[in-house]
Amino acid sequence: MAGNTFGQLFTVTTFGESHGAGLGCIIDGCPPGLELSEADIQFDLDRRKPGTSRHVTQRREADQVEILSGVFEGKTTGTPIALLIRNTDQRSKDYGNIATSFRPGHADYTYWHKYGTRDYRGGGRSSARETAARVAAGAVAKKWLKEKFGTEITAYVTQVGEKEIRFEGCEHISQNPFFAANHSQIAELENYMDSVRKSLDSVGAKLHIEAANVPVGLGEPVFDRLDAEIAYAMMGINAVKGVEIGAGFDSVTQRGSEHGDELTPQGFLSNHSGGILGGISTGQDIRVNIAIKPTSSIATPRRSIDINGNPIELATHGRHDPCVGLRSAPIAEAMLALVLIDHALRHRAQNADVQVNTPDITLSNK
């Protein structure tokens, strides 16, 4: 079965390829009455778009979104919302040398074996360019979540290659090309990325994603646990190779007396769970880390094969990110938002009338 649709009640189906006429998505299940304009969506697309600094791909795309349906007189109608982003700066000639060969680390080999054909221009459907449609859909989800619950979703880069980035404040994220919550290390990171590009190589990255003001109760045990759905969503982002929620892999070295978040009438005393217990949100901040592999498109020659199985040496030419993780923060935010809105609607559908006498202790800290 095709895997182009995400979600159950708030569904997003994306379409398009890297070098096609355009790409976009169909959102179905968005509640009616949400004030929505193209400007609401454009803000996050501008954060993700290419060509914004020398440290990312120099492909120049405006990524201007068009709302084709589902919005009338400035508000959502409850009918499918169609969003379109046209491609304007394709340079397909850069990919002629891979029409009959497979780039190491890319989906070329697997797409060829699965479908028997592939759009080799910029990776086609497997390109990270497809994530522009996810960011557009995520912007809609983020706006609804903020208006409904006050939910705020923030992502930032915590490591680039071997360079760990100290947290100095979220106010710095929008002020540098690295989506870093840091000011003092930016010059160091600039020099580091310049050296990576000059070496004709690439590096990976680590990101932290956090959602504040998430209501208690989201998640559908046992198979659609909130943490399971978040991990699924994050692993669906191009180049993501690892996901941690809460303490993550550090949980291995913790004792139970440390890891278990104690409760008091004034709130939880820690958040090693990452805001999720038993697959259900606790009302605390949801905390996620993701690891992103080095960009596979590099100009350094590497061994591969052609479609006939013959050995070749291949160097990838064109415009590529030396660290694809640098533009991943808006994508990760979008995917977390899509999970949360879907589960908020699912929770409302089944449990809207549930009432308990126990107070929501997370509210005392807000």
From Swiss-Prot:
Sequence positions that bind FMN: R125, S126, S127, N238, A239, G278, K293, P294, T295, S296, S297, R319
Cofactor(s) this protein requires: FMNH2
GO MF annotation, one: chorismate synthase activity
EC number, UniProt record: 4.2.3.5
Keyword set includes Flavoprotein: yes
Record-linked SUPFAM superfamilies: Chorismate synthase, AroC
Gene Ontology CC terms, in alphabetical order: cytosol
InterPro entries xref list: Chorismate_synth (IPR000453), Chorismate_synth_AroC_sf (IPR035904), Chorismate_synthase_CS (IPR020541)
NCBIfam families: aroC (TIGR00033), PRK05382.1 (NF003793)
Protein name per the record: Chorismate synthase
Source organism (scientific name): Neisseria meningitidis serogroup B (strain ATCC BAA-335 / MC58)
